[in-house]
């Protein structure tokens, strides 16, 4: 008996009444429940980008290095000499809040599959994480679970996690963010795509068996959380990194043959989205025979088989006659493999079950014909009052040294050593710069000896507070800071991926934030010549109507050549000159200092002059490549004082302890405005450098050639951070505060750990 489609069933599938009406018009009949499930996931925000697509089309997506832009599993850029890099960043926010370990682990697994599906071997991962107020009872539970999940999956896969960022803010109390980034290397002339080409070609299932885990995960990721959130735990997928490792090696072996026509990861919406998207890209139809799908649970229905998000699975279109070759390779790696369908010329997507057609749908309405909304937009009503705030009315701290210590202990600024110590960042020895610096640097020599001179710089970041106060400017800052981080290691930025995390797009102020952030990213990318080659949108990050800060995370890739000429982010030698490339404005709007010391999140983000920004970056990049610098460190959260303190604390200490873990400096800073504003303001376009005295004159000449201002501040040495007329604090004391920030969050939670975990 066919189940009747009622308004309640439509609503349970996350579809609006007008969307259901569109389905009726497309089909000319009432859909079956299975067909409704297919429309539900394919028209979800997660799969269709129905609220965001009209804005995303404004991104710059092409350039001389772009081999594959948005629309595939990952973007691909040319690294020269026949080599290419595939990379992407994607969110796993909703699952990670419900079940932090598995949510984060399967997020890593999914992004790894997106990259190796392109034909690339993954060589490095990063992540950008957001958690709630450090004192919130659930924060430590989520932090520990997410970090363990990322480490557990990535370490088993043998892919090092080489960097990332972690920040805390009360807006994430009900919605943590887990944005995972992976990069892989492949021959520039052997890119594989998710296309169902060649009528008559077999469609093959490869990987783990299908179970009931993750059903309607894509729909869950397209809705707000409420009091029933815990009931959604069954929609979180369960990962098996050992199975994924086998799948990775099998796919890379298959790519060495002529058997693969197209291949797609079964990610969000599982078999449904992978098969529909492949048919859409190929301009063809597809017939699936669901009784051929390898199952791990008895009694599964066609609906469950199609919408399951079981992990570690691939859908592959093979060249006709190559089925046995595919089968032999997959069985060698102990993977399930089966022919489950055929490419057709019908333009229709059909699912068969035990001799009956259980779904028969035109492909176009599921892909390009999905709804596209121009949602209403209006600036956030709170902004005029926030912009009118005058920080000059605030009292100046009586003890600037104590204020610096408090900032260093803030979990957003504090050392992330507790986090990256749980990741295997040394596996395969790819890192040229250890975690904790401004950007990660990955050597290509490990996998590609002839490219030993090349390295890749990787950076992720965004300041959500800036993006709330001015979405356009805040998003530009995100791109600029990633590029600045890459300049600090001598890299040339070449392209970005993004992960756009926002609240409910049906609220005009949220849609305005989204559109303005997209505009800001686009304009900044045009200025830096860094096209957007891949990305992800995560909407409905709200709980009980409370949304997150707009968080458009940017992941940037740069080329470091030669890789031997890179740079550390911390001071290296006593007697070195300390200088600031950039200027001192004392802009504290939206700063960590304003929030930490005065409880204010107001004002305007610092002004950003892109010409000045590019001049600062070019100065430092050329200086690193010329071997002039001992260290280079971006000034960001916490401002110049925090950058000085962090530069005093060496991140890499010899195992024998022969070098102390810190070194001091003495500087004299000109104070054009209040001292606390100059010390802790987060002015844009600034890099703190140290260099041998004999290189100082050449460095100043180089800065003048590039058009960047340089302020000589002082010298490295001693065991204190001394800022003349402002503060003098032992570096050991600074290090203690900085290194204890994250462990303090976990200790604070220990007393009420039972309240943090679900019952």
UniProtKB/Swiss-Prot annotation:
Residues that coordinate or bind substrate: 91-94, 113, 237, 309-311, 538
SUPFAM superfamilies, alphabetized: PurM C-terminal domain-like (SSF56042), PurM N-terminal domain-like (SSF55326)
GO MF entries: ATP binding; magnesium ion binding; phosphoribosylformylglycinamidine synthase activity
Key words of the record: ATP-binding, Cytoplasm, Ligase, Magnesium, Metal-binding, Nucleotide-binding, Purine biosynthesis
Binding site for ATP: 49, 88, 498, 535
Cellular compartments annotated: Cytoplasm
GO annotation, cellular component aspect: cytoplasm
Pfam families: AIRS (PF00586), AIRS_C (PF02769), FGAR-AT_linker (PF18072)
Annotated residues for binding of Mg(2+) 1: 90, 536
Residues that hold Mg(2+) 2 according to the record: 114, 265
Active site residues according to the UniProt entry: 46, 92 (proton acceptor)
Annotated Gene3D superfamilies: PurM-like C-terminal domain (3.90.650.10), PurM-like, N-terminal domain (3.30.1330.10)
Pathway: Purine metabolism; IMP biosynthesis via de novo pathway; 5-amino-1-(5-phospho-D-ribosyl)imidazole from N(2)-formyl-N(1)-(5-phospho-D-ribosyl)glycinamide: step 1/2
Domain of life: Bacteria
Catalytic activity as recorded in UniProt: N(2)-formyl-N(1)-(5-phospho-beta-D-ribosyl)glycinamide + L-glutamine + ATP + H2O = 2-formamido-N(1)-(5-O-phospho-beta-D-ribosyl)acetamidine + L-glutamate + ADP + phosphate + H(+)
Catalytic activity, EC: 6.3.5.3
Function: Part of the phosphoribosylformylglycinamidine synthase complex involved in the purines biosynthetic pathway. Catalyzes the ATP-dependent conversion of formylglycinamide ribonucleotide (FGAR) and glutamine to yield formylglycinamidine ribonucleotide (FGAM) and glutamate. The FGAM synthase complex is composed of three subunits. PurQ produces an ammonia molecule by converting glutamine to glutamate. PurL transfers the ammonia molecule to FGAR to form FGAM in an ATP-dependent manner.
Similarity comment: family membership: Belongs to the FGAMS family.
Quaternary structure and interacting proteins, as annotated: Monomer. Part of the FGAM synthase complex composed of 1 PurL, 1 PurQ and 2 PurS subunits.
PANTHER family per record: PHOSPHORIBOSYLFORMYLGLYCINAMIDINE SYNTHASE SUBUNIT PURL
Protein name as it appears in the record: Phosphoribosylformylglycinamidine synthase subunit PurL
Species name: Anaeromyxobacter dehalogenans (strain 2CP-C)
């Amino acid at each position: 008996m066919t189940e009747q489609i009622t308004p309640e069933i439509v609503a349970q599938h996350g579809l609006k009444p007008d969307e259901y009406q569109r389905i009726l018009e497309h089909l000319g009949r009432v859909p079956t429940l299975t067909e409704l499930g297919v429309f539900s996931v394919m028209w979800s925000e997660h799969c269709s980008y129905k609220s965001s697509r009209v804005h995303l089309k404004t991104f710059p997506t092409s350039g001389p290095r772009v081999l594959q832009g948005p629309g595939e599993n990952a973007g691909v850029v040319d690294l020269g000499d026949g080599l290419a890099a595939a990379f992407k960043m994607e969110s796993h926010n909703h699952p990670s809040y419900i079940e932090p370990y598995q949510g984060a682990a399967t997020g890593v697994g999914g992004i790894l599959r997106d990259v190796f599906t392109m034909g690339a071997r993954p060589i490095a991962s990063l992540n950008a994480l957001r958690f709630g107020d450090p004192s919130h009872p659930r924060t430590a539970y989520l932090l520990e679970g997410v970090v363990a999940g990322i480490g557990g999956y990535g370490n088993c896969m043998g892919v090092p996690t080489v960097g990332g960022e972690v920040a805390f803010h009360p807006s994430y109390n009900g919605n943590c963010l887990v944005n995972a980034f992976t990069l892989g290397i492949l021959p520039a002339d052997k890119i594989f795509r998710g296309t169902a080409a060649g009528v008559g070609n077999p469609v093959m299932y490869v990987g783990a068996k299908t179970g009931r885990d993750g059903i309607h995960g894509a729909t869950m990721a397209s809705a707000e959380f409420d009091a029933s959130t815990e009931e959604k735990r069954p929609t979180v997928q369960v990962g098996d990194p050992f199975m994924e490792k086998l799948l990775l090696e099998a796919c890379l072996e298959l790519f060495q043959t002529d058997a693969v026509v197209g291949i797609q990861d079964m990610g969000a919406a599982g078999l449904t989205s992978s098969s529909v998207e492949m048919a859409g890209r190929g301009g063809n139809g597809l017939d699936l025979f669901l009784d051929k799908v390898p199952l791990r649970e008895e009694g599964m229905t066609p609906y469950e088989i199609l919408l399951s998000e079981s992990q570690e699975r691939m859908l592959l279109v093979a060249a006709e006659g190559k089925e046995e070759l595919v089968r032999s390779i997959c069985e060698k790696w102990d993977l399930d493999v089966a022919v489950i369908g055929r490419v057709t010329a019908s333009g229709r997507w059909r699912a068969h079950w035990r001799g009956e057609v259980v779904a028969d749908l035109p492909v176009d309405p599921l892909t390009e014909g999905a709804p596209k909304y121009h949602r209403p937009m209006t600036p956030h009503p709170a902004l005029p009052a926030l912009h009118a705030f005058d920080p000059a009315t605030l009292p100046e701290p009586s003890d600037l040294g104590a204020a610096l210590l408090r900032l260093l202990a803030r979990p957003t600024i504090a050392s992330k050593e507790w986090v990256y110590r749980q990741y295997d960042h040394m596996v395969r020895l790819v890192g040229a710069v250890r975690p904790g610096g401004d950007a990660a640097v990955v050597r290509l020599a490990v996998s590609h000896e002839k490219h030993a001179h090349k390295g890749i710089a990787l950076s992720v970041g965004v300041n959500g507070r800036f993006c709330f106060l001015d979405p356009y400017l805040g998003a530009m800052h995100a791109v600029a800071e990633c590029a600045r981080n890459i300049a600090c290691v001598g890299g040339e930025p070449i392209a970005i991926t993004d992960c756009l995390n926002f609240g409910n797009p049906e609220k005009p102020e949220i849609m305005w934030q989204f559109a303005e952030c997209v505009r800001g990213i686009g304009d900044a990318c045009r200025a830096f010549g860094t096209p957007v080659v891949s990305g992800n949108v995560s909407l409905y990050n709200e709980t009980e109507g409370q949304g997150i800060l707009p968080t458009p995370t940017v992941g940037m890739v740069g080329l470091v050549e030669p890789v031997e000429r890179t740079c550390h982010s911390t001071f290296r030698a006593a007697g070195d000159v300390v200088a600031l490339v950039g200027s001192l404005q004392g802009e504290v709007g939206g700063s960590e200092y304003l929030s930490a010391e005065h409880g204010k999140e107001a004002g305007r983000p610092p002004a950003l002059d892109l010409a000045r920004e590019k001049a600062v970056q070019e100065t430092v990049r050329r200086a690193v490549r010329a071997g002039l610098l001992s260290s280079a460190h971006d000034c960001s959260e916490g401002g110049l004082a925090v950058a000085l303190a962090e530069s005093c604390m060496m991140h890499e200490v010899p195992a024998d302890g022969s070098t102390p873990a810190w070194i001091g400096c003495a500087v004299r800073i000109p104070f054009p405005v209040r001292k606390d504003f100059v010390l802790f303001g987060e002015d844009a376009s600034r890099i703190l450098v140290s260099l041998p005295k004999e290189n100082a004159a050449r460095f100043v000449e180089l800065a003048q050639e590039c058009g960047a201002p340089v302020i000589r501040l002082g010298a490295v040495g001693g065991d204190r951070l001394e800022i003349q007329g402002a503060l003098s604090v032992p570096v050991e004391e600074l290090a203690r505060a900085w290194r204890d920030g994250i462990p303090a969050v976990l200790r604070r939670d220990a007393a009420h750990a039972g309240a943090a975990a679900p019952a």
